[in-house]
């Protein structure tokens, strides 16, 4: 993802949707809530990356240790993690996943089309096609 975003810094907008796979990972919902809460303090990606590193142990205690490590305001983090707004955002993201038949992560779309070849070359071809189709003809 970083490589394709770097190749098209002015042409792409990356949108991340939460999709906690709670049927597979018992702590997935808390991890999603933590990423959303950290994002409200400008550290969403950092939280995501740190949680990915400890994905085998995503207990609430471990998640909070990561929040402390990232220097988050813990009162705000706890409030945001448990807020109805965070729950709604995640439920809305899950609704989008259901509506688009997404059932696993990661899943990528470029201009509404499912990316089947997630290599840099595959994504680049789809981005180039979308950009060519978006340009007005002369």
Predicted regions span which residues?
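Structural alpha/beta surface segment adjacent to cysteine/selenocysteine redox centers
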Residues: 1-68, 128-135
């Amino acid at each position: 993802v970083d490589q394709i975003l770097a190749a098209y810094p002015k042409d792409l907008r990356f949108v991340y949707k939460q999709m906690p796979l709670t049927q597979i990972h018992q702590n997935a919902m808390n991890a999603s809530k933590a990423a959303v809460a950290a994002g409200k303090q400008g550290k969403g990606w950092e939280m995501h990356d740190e949680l990915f590193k400890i994905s085998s142990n995503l207990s609430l205690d471990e998640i909070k240790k990561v929040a402390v490590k990232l220097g988050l305001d813990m009162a705000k983090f706890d409030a945001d993690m448990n807020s109805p707004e965070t729950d709604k955002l995640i439920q809305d993201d899950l609704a989008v996943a259901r509506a688009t038949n997404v059932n696993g992560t990661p899943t990528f779309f470029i201009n509404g089309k499912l990316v089947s070849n997630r290599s840099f070359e595959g994504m680049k071809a789809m981005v180039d096609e979308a950009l060519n189709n978006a340009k007005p003809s002369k």
